[in-house]
Amino acid sequence: MTLLSPGIENKEINLASAIGRAATGRAAMVGKFEWGPAYSITQVTSESDLVTIFGRPNDYTAASFMTANNFLKYGNDLRLVRICDATTAQNATPLYNAVEYTIGASNGCVVGDDITITYSGVGALTAKGKVLEVDAGNNNAASKIFLPSAEIVAAAKSDGNYPSVGTITLQPTQGDIALTNIEIIDTGSVYFPNIELAFDALTAIETEGGALKYADLIEKQGFPRLSARYVGDFGDAISVEIINYADYQTAFAFAAGHTLGDIELPIYPDGGTRSINLSSYFTFGPSNSNQYAVIVRVSGEVEEAFIVSTNPGDKDVNGQSIFIDEYFENSGSAYITAIAEGWKTESGAYNFGGGSDANAGADDWMFGLDMLSDPEVLYTNLVIAGNAAAEEVSIASTVQKYAIDSVGNVRQDCVVFVSPPQSLIVNKQAGTAVANIQGWRTGIDPTNGQAVVDNLNVSTTYAVIDGNYKYQYDKYNDRNRWVPLAGDIAGLCAYTDQVSQPWMSPAGFNRGQIKGVNRLAVDLRRAHRDALYQIGINPVVGFAGQGFVLYGDKTATQQASAFDRINVRRLFNLLKKAISDAAKYRLFELNDEFTRSSFKSEIDAYLTNIQDLGGVYDFRVVCDETNNPGSVIDRNEFVASIYVKPAKSINFITLNFVATSTDADFAEIIG
């Protein structure tokens, strides 16, 4: 402000700005996992994180899981996007194997009465149904019933009708009930890829003339709106026990012959009961009739126990909200989610089923990769796409080519790591495997000159291709698996950043040692390596007593230039990121001599440090009136030109051994 009377005004101006070092070891990957949020970017820093968030490997997910885990053996910052097929994926729910029905003629029923169920060819079933609601204005006709499903499902599968059923007749204790349109629900009946979309999915109801939605079906069964937190058949192992305030108090009331904490819960939708002791899981229980004790089991083992409430104002002893909607939205459970709407007041145990996440196609991989394409949303400099190589050749080629074209070439600040399709190289003779890789890489089969439709015929400096597979032990399933090497090659880049600098090559005996290899798919001899290296494929080779080594550092370009090496590509990615971040602070400043010279000084200082560390041989920065003439200034532009002589890695070593006579003069020979 302007002083209007004598005084002192302090102003602070910062002229000490500098260019900071950009992170270089962050990787991103899209893949198939058995658990975890789908189509959401999640940070993973360790194998423990990976297992906790995304589950363990199985035959469907092993390539993605082990590729991600292999990267984490070298680096510690991985951003993952789980994919699934939205048309077939399902969250597991208590609706699976519940009996869906339409009540026809009914009268004279009483709420709470048992229902005897008779199945054609089987007779009366052991488990009894229950009348849940009646319509007093319609002769006490039953409007909602519960039918325990375990015996019905078994009978339907036995007679080959499942998910349809044979003839079922019902006889309540009082009155009559006749059913039509009886079916067994054979899916989870709801899909949401991540928790942000859960509420809408759990509240959606039937549109006029449309099929019943999850909310309609769950309400009809009389169940609370519960679901597995994520899609996938891992959710089928979940079981949830809910105990209301009154039953919790009764469980801890003194009574002859009663063990404190014991309670018996009806099981839905199967039927039967389950006995548990609450004192094993809770130190305090529900404090009012709005609150419920919840126990979550996975494969029968208790994983979580907590208190939730249907009242939006309720909090726990730490002041955190336990309102059902907020509790689950805020990651209160790692396994389930629920909403307060439609919550049931009765206690019960609910078995989940119907989860699915199989059949992800190339389109699903592409949707996931699209989430990595915007550098303003996510900064990453290593993109792993080679886990898709375990898919069939057409998907492997399409997905990896898309990763290069739509992520690497669009962002131009990262390197995409790809691997050859597994079926082309695993269990093949070396000559056949090399020919297969050549055909895939060039689009021309070298054995007959025919076009190869599913190929990786691209030329770019923003991709790196490896040329082998490793046979690796899967400790989670006690077996060995063939795994693509893209995660390891990206990991070597992160490891190189840790022990050296990004502009150093990740290949060779010093920094290129591949971990966790039992054996390689192909033993690449010199002739094989020569053939692959000429088309930009980096061999991975086993040397007796010296480990398994990345034995090449080319990018995927077919043009001879400085950028045909990984270290130069990564050097320039680093420079572009760091200097462009600093350039943001010149936006909306004046294009004058002070702005230009200060920016040039920052770049000079930054590049001098890079030069001192061996990243560049020399550089020159031009940011003055020669490239910022009046015409540039009048267009509100600002131009800086940065010339760099990048350091080159050694790929070929020549050792000249010369024998001379005993009295030869080296000065004369060498000069």
UniProtKB/Swiss-Prot annotation:
InterPro entries: Gp18-like_dom_I, Gp18_domIII_N, Phage_sheath-like_beta, Phage_sheath_subtilisin, Phage_Tail_Sheath_Structural, Tail_sheath_C
UniProt GO BP: symbiont genome ejection through host cell envelope, contractile tail mechanism
Main location: virion
Keywords assigned by UniProt, alphabetized: Host cytoplasm, Viral contractile tail ejection system, Viral genome ejection through host cell envelope, Viral penetration into host cytoplasm, Viral tail protein, Viral tail sheath protein, Virion, Virus entry into host cell
Disulfide links within the chain: none
Gene Ontology cellular component list: host cell cytoplasm; virus tail, sheath
Compartments (UniProt record): Virion; Host cytoplasm
The protein's assembly and partners: Homomultimer.
Role: Polymerizes as an extended structure around the baseplate-tail tube complex. During ejection, the sheath shifts to a contracted form, thereby making the inner tail tube protrude through the host cell envelope.
Family according to the record: Belongs to the myoviridae tail sheath protein family.
Protein name: Tail sheath protein
Protein species of origin: Vibrio phage KVP40 (isolate Vibrio parahaemolyticus/Japan/Matsuzaki/1991)
Gene for this chain: 18
